Amino acid sequence: QPKPARRTYIPKKNGKMRPLGIPSFEDKLLQEVIRMILEAIYEGHFENTSHGFRPNRSCHTALNEIQKTFTGVKWFIEGDIKGFFDNINHATLIGILRERINDERFLRLVRKFLNAGYIENWTFHNTYSGTPQGGIISPILANIYLDKFDKYVNEYVRKFKKGKKRMRTKEYRRNEVELSKARIALKNANDDCERENAIARIRQLEKERVNIPPSDPMDNNYARLVYVRYADDWLCGVIGSKEDCKKIKEDFKNFLKEQLQLELSEEKTLI
């Protein structure tokens, strides 16, 4: 039977205190074995959009992913799950684990750690939900829990996609037509004067072209959604309208509430 964790606090950036549960040495060893087993089972099935608490991934790989894939986005949705680590539903988590793990003894052991409780000021407290921050198995359990959300979002991304490429702007298309005419004029020039005029016209149009946006950012027939998650923080980039963003936020909020019993923070989830 795991022992209750020792509750301690560390300061957060906003001045508040973050609770940590420090397990005993024996429990740390057992948790590390559980973590290794869970990693062997789940690591290969996690989505590439997840970067927190994973081998060879970090906040730096998440930032690189944003730099590579968030090009051309018009809107950002910054997601914050209210008290995520404290509100993981134990029954839902065990149900998710049971989908891949057919070993009830192992699942009971995981549940014992979830229900081990903590001691603060010499008083024992039960834990009915959440995973203790500071526990060795907490990060991978959090990823397993939110992998359901990752898979939902990535399917949402595929359905949201609309159009093959953005429509060209009127100015860019006009420039293309004029440039084509100038090149034909150069090809059909009868003397040096006509040739020089055509070359000058081509250079002028090419110079103007540099300052003309080629694609229309307001094209309603083109839409894209990109997503990256690090631990319980996630970010979406949207090529679409603000109404699209509001619908995405509402859909994500409903999925988290109905499927994972989690709540989006209205104050911190921003468009």
Language model segments and positions:
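Non-catalytic terminal/accessory segments
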Residues: 1-271
